[in-house]
């Protein structure tokens, strides 16, 4: 008997592509229902049938909800009329997609990237709201019947225990987007040469500079280190807070910052490898959820990490496990400055942290996708 599976994810990126490809190895017919598919270094297998739905629109809260709802209705009709003989793998985008399992009676698994109804608290829907209470009941019923409930971190797994027995929860960590990432010495790094950074000790932040990213504390750290002209804070990316941080740097008369916009993906191996220390930030609201995807790219280039996150975060657990950096609370700016100075003064310590990052990277490769099947 043929094994058929349809996977559902409104916004598909490299992680989902790798997961779908893992299913394609073991299943006869594989379909992907998606609104958008972001280009990845690894392409979808030729045997995968792509079935398009409405693209997820992040531009406003109303558009998010409308595209979620419309996408869910499209998924329902496709499952009823096109995929009657298919096992189903739901991803929580749209968040309500797996609720269709109430009406679509066939084997299913659920991949939990965002936990609902818990995420509804961000818009004021709390445990006392009827929608919240009803969703809790749905979760307990549907999770119990699922073949697999898969999530991204131990912290998220702990939250899911409110809805399903821990034995049914499988934690699978994410992985790097690229196979091309590896350490590149500064002397052989064209990105370093282009920006004349050969003699700099580089503190790198690469990523979004939004309201939830505590990048501005790097300005306070730089104040402590202003007397060392060899230390450079390299900020790569864009976001709502970038201009504010540039203003802070200007007002403090700091010359130790270089701001660059997003770099071409071909530059990524070189820009990440430029880091003597790589910075990752998490706010309190997201600390328990998962490890930022950029972490795995930084591990692959052997970057020592300086994490600005709560000590009970998933990121802190990773760093403590692999001993490849240190985590600090956001107000520990002086301690972070001391940490940077220590790594600059003791290259042997930085070298050990770098080796530990490379060792950790071996646990976070796209082969992890095989665990989903």
List each model region and its residues.
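Nucleotide-sugar-dependent
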Residues: 213, 262-271, 278-299, 304-317
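Carbohydrate-associated surface elements
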Residues: 155, 172-175
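An aromatic- and histidine-rich active-site surface loop
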Residues: 14-17, 70-75, 80, 87-119
């Amino acid at each position: 008997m043929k094994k058929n599976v349809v996977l559902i994810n409104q916004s598909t990126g490299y992680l989902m592509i790798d997961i779908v490809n893992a299913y394609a190895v073991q299943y006869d017919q594989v379909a992907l229902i998606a609104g958008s598919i972001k280009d990845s270094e690894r392409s979808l297998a030729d045997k995968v049938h792509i079935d398009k739905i409405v693209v997820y629109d992040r531009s406003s809260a109303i558009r998010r909800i409308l595209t979620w709802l419309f996408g869910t209705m499209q998924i329902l009709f496709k499952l009823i009329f096109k995929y009657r003989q298919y096992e189903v793998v739901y991803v929580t985008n749209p968040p309500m997609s797996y609720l269709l399992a109430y009406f679509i009676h066939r084997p299913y698994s659920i991949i939990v990237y965002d936990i609902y109804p818990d995420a509804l608290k961000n818009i004021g829907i709390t445990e006392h709201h009827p929608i919240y209470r009803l969703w809790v009941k749905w979760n307990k019923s549907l999770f119990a019947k699922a073949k697999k409930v898969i999530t991204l971190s131990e912290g998220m797994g702990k939250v899911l225990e409110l809805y399903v027995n821990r034995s049914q929860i499988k934690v699978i960590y994410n992985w790097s987007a690229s196979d091309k990432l590896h350490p590149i010495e500064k002397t052989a790094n064209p990105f370093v040469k282009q920006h004349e950074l050969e003699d700099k000790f580089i503190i790198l932040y690469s990523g979004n500079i939004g309201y939830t990213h505590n990048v501005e504390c790097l300005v306070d750290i730089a104040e402590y280190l202003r007397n060392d002209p060899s230390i450079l804070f390299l900020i790569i990316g864009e976001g709502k807070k970038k201009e504010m941080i540039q203003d802070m740097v200007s007002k403090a008369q700091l010359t130790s910052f270089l701001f660059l916009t997003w770099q071409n993906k071909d530059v990524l191996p070189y820009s990440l490898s430029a880091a003597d220390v790589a910075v990752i930030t998490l706010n309190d609201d997201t600390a328990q959820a998962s490890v930022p995807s950029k972490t795995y790219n930084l591990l692959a280039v052997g970057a020592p990490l300086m994490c600005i996150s709560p000590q009970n975060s998933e990121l802190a657990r990773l760093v403590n496990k692999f001993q490849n950096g240190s985590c600090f609370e956001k107000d520990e700016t002086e301690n972070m400055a001391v940490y940077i100075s220590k790594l600059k003064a003791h290259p042997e310590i930085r070298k050990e942290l770098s080796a530990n990052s490379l060792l950790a990277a071996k646990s976070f490769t796209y082969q992890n996708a095989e665990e989903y099947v």
